[in-house]
């Protein structure tokens, strides 16, 4: 375990760890949780997936926990307001999709679902066997609880109980699967230490925790959001091209953290890329984008992203071909819409309806600044409508927002 700790420190991705962890000898098992609050994992989850892969490389058996029960509650960590509760059918569907995704990214890994043990736990048993081991004083002292208790929003008993459920998960895995280590982002440290204390109070043995830094920008905001929404790992929600472009657009100062947390490149290569960042940041970002997209979507997904990028950006000053437009739509960089749904509508309304712009206000500003392009020509009039003369090959329209954001409309 000492080798892993040293590597994480050298890489700069060790946030916190339990005393004595470095002396733990392998083989041991470690787990990391994924709550099914959406039908897809997002780019923030990729940090955890890479972390589990890193553990496996050091002889530690990784376990992925899908929170089929805790996903019904919602983790208050890092949240200023309470999550909207999902219904049971949605959580069940999300859980299946998340488990399938984890199995594809982590072949052979043990995947467990806490609904299998928490779902049958009665309220009386929970209060007797779990609740009695926790003291309100220490729970209220946790940062995540303290921040919410004294906020205008407050915290519900439902969210307040999340810490106990996560602690029970750790104890269950410790007892049933000999999982002695729980890992997570830095915002999970309070929950993890509560689980360690719970395991000790029950006399089960010594457990440990290990956390990595959250991936945030210079303002402390989690990386992985854009004006269009979350960056998903499911290619149907975020096509490989969009994932590729997301990393190309990141500020130069953020790419160093990205390559440490979202890739498995060895430390020596990371340090060499750090040096190259000062002289050629765009080349480094392109390389890191290629590494991550290939890791997430495979060689085929990377090829799609590269082909789409070449078609979009090499098309400036030349006509884009029908074959290129078809390939872009098939690679997920397009949207298929019935012709009758859009012909005759204002572009101002269309770009909002398709999610290309977040609001009419944003669309108006882009038009006024000549930053919204239709088939590579700036849209000058916000009252302009889509008519048949604007269709390429009587079917397609190429939308552009500035230099980076592109989309093909397929009026099939």
From Swiss-Prot:
InterPro entries reported in the protein's UniProt record: aa-tRNA-synth_Ic (IPR002305), Rossmann-like_a/b/a_fold (IPR014729), S4_RNA-bd (IPR002942), S4_RNA-bd_sf (IPR036986), Tyr-tRNA-ligase (IPR002307), Tyr-tRNA-ligase_bac-type (IPR024088), Tyr-tRNA-ligase_bac_1 (IPR024107)
Molecular function via GO: ATP binding; RNA binding; tyrosine-tRNA ligase activity
Main location per the UniProt record: cytoplasm
Gene Ontology biological process terms, A to Z: tyrosyl-tRNA aminoacylation
Record SMART domains: S4
Reaction(s) catalysed (UniProt annotation): tRNA(Tyr) + L-tyrosine + ATP = L-tyrosyl-tRNA(Tyr) + AMP + diphosphate + H(+)
Matching SUPFAM superfamilies: Alpha-L RNA-binding motif (SSF55174), Nucleotidylyl transferase (SSF52374)
Annotated residues for binding of L-tyrosine: 31, 162, 166
Pfam families (alphabetical): S4, tRNA-synt_1b
Motif range ('HIGH' region): 36-45
Chain location of the short sequence motif 'KMSKS' region per the record: 222-226
GO cellular component, one term: cytosol
Enzyme Commission number(s) from the entry: 6.1.1.1
Sorted UniProt keywords: Aminoacyl-tRNA synthetase, ATP-binding, Cytoplasm, Ligase, Nucleotide-binding, Protein biosynthesis, RNA-binding
Compartments (UniProt record): Cytoplasm
Binding-site residues, ATP: 225
Segments forming domain S4 RNA-binding: 345-411
PANTHER family: TYROSINE--TRNA LIGASE, MITOCHONDRIAL, TYROSYL-TRNA SYNTHETASE
Function, as annotated: Catalyzes the attachment of tyrosine to tRNA(Tyr) in a two-step reaction: tyrosine is first activated by ATP to form Tyr-AMP and then transferred to the acceptor end of tRNA(Tyr).
Subunit (UniProt): Homodimer.
Family statement drawn from the similarity comment of this UniProt entry: Belongs to the class-I aminoacyl-tRNA synthetase family. TyrS type 1 subfamily.
Full protein name: Tyrosine--tRNA ligase
Organism the protein comes from: Chlamydia trachomatis serovar A (strain ATCC VR-571B / DSM 19440 / HAR-13)
